[in-house]
Swiss-Prot record:
Protein name (record): Methionyl-tRNA formyltransferase
Catalytic activity entry: L-methionyl-tRNA(fMet) + (6R)-10-formyltetrahydrofolate = N-formyl-L-methionyl-tRNA(fMet) + (6S)-5,6,7,8-tetrahydrofolate + H(+)
Keyword Nucleotide-binding applies: no
Xref: InterPro entries: Formyl_trans_C, Formyl_trans_C_sf, Formyl_transferase-like_C_sf, Met-tRNA-FMT_C
Family statement: Belongs to the Fmt family.
Keywords: Protein biosynthesis, Transferase
Enzyme Commission number, as recorded: 2.1.2.9
Lineage: superkingdom: Bacteria
Gene Ontology molecular functions: methionyl-tRNA formyltransferase activity
Physiological role: Attaches a formyl group to the free amino group of methionyl-tRNA(fMet). The formyl group appears to play a dual role in the initiator identity of N-formylmethionyl-tRNA by promoting its recognition by IF2 and preventing the misappropriation of this tRNA by the elongation apparatus.
Amino acid sequence: YFSYNDKVIKILEAEYLNTIHHVTAGTVISDKLEIACGSGILQVKKLQQESKKALNVEEFLRGTNILKATILK
């Protein structure tokens, strides 16, 4: 899970990509909600904002604008 705009968002489905990057862990590195991890990239597929229904990443991003280079915690 991560927090964004004071809301908890659960990652329900994701794929790990074993890709080298040079950014801080937690940084959004693409418009498709790919997040840098310690030693790779987490490609988010499905998530759920608190008190909302589960959505695939495309549906979620239509209503929530998480910009590239945002650092998630």
